[in-house]
């Protein structure tokens, strides 16, 4: 009588057949990688608040979190980048199309090195809102950008938490 092939046994072709067991629906929510957008004003300079906020994210959610910013080199997002990488979190930035692509850029290579256009700043908000699960905004936002930002939040059904 032939023995039936079970999990982990070597079959005729010499390859090991492995079947992944189901872990249940209760634990599936923990497997999803969370994308948290932390964006802010270029004049925001409270480094301690940003550092403590990112540290609390790491302590509460673990290191399987992706921090998303617009890639600004000044203000809040400069410190978000520094501390997200320092604490070992994944980091993605959606910098404007007129800049060069870097190691942490979220768009493809052909998106970058374009001539400057004023709507590129608004397109950053599109990318951030589209790719994030939670959005936190440090400091104030310009009125011209706020209208566009609020429309995007309504379109994608997301909410933002404004922090000072």
Positions of PLM-derived features:
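Acidic/glycine-enriched connector segments
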Residues: 18, 22-33, 44-164
């Amino acid at each position: 009588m032939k023995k039936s092939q079970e999990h982990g046994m070597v079959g005729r072709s010499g390859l090991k057949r492995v079947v992944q067991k189901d872990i249940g629906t209760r634990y599936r929510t923990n497997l999803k990688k969370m994308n948290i957008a932390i964006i802010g004003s270029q004049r925001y300079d409270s480094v301690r608040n940003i550092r403590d906020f990112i540290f609390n994210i790491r302590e509460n959610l673990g290191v399987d979190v992706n921090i998303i910013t617009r890639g600004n080199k000044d203000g809040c997002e400069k410190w978000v980048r520094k501390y997200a990488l320092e604490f070992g979190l994944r980091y993605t930035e959606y910098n404007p199309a007129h800049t060069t692509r870097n190691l942490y850029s979220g768009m493809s290579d052909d998106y970058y090195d374009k001539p400057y256009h004023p709507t590129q700043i608004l397109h950053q908000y599109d990318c951030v809102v589209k790719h994030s699960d939670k959005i936190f905004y440090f400091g104030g936002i310009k009125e011209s950008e706020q209208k566009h930002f609020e429309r995007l939040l309504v379109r994608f059904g997301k909410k933002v938490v404004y922090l000072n």
